[in-house]
């Protein structure tokens, strides 16, 4: 609850505007030459995920995720409550352990490879 509470205080309208300002500056450069950019919410324990308010989740969706959809070659992946992860994948209440890190890397790699295959098939 403490981490979720801290994030709720940090994530304000001004904070969202600041994030969007920097994304507008960075994304054109990052996606140059048809490069893919993936933003993701990392996996969370069920306890941490439950501690985040529904308002925080919906505000993030409205402010950031919808904003990212405006850009070519930018994807968003929400792994916050992804079923691939269990409590055994965490070293504490919010950080992945070694096995969890391997699992996350595998999921992200697969996403990039599949995205590239789709592009090559088009």
Q: Model regions: which residues?
A:
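Secreted/periplasmic serine-hydrolase-like ester/acetyl group-modifying domain
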Residues: 1-33
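Active-site segments of SGNH/GDSL-like serine hydrolases
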Residues: 27-53
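A structural motif corresponding to the C-terminal end of an alpha-helix
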Residues: 24-37, 67-76
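C-terminal regions of proteins
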Residues: 55, 59-122
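Second-shell loop/turn segments in exported
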Residues: 9-16, 49-54, 90-95
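Generic detector of short, locally flexible boundary/turn motifs and exposed helical patches
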Residues: 2-6, 40-44, 68
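Structured catalytic/translocation cores of nucleotide/phosphate-coupled proteins
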Residues: 19-23, 39, 104-112
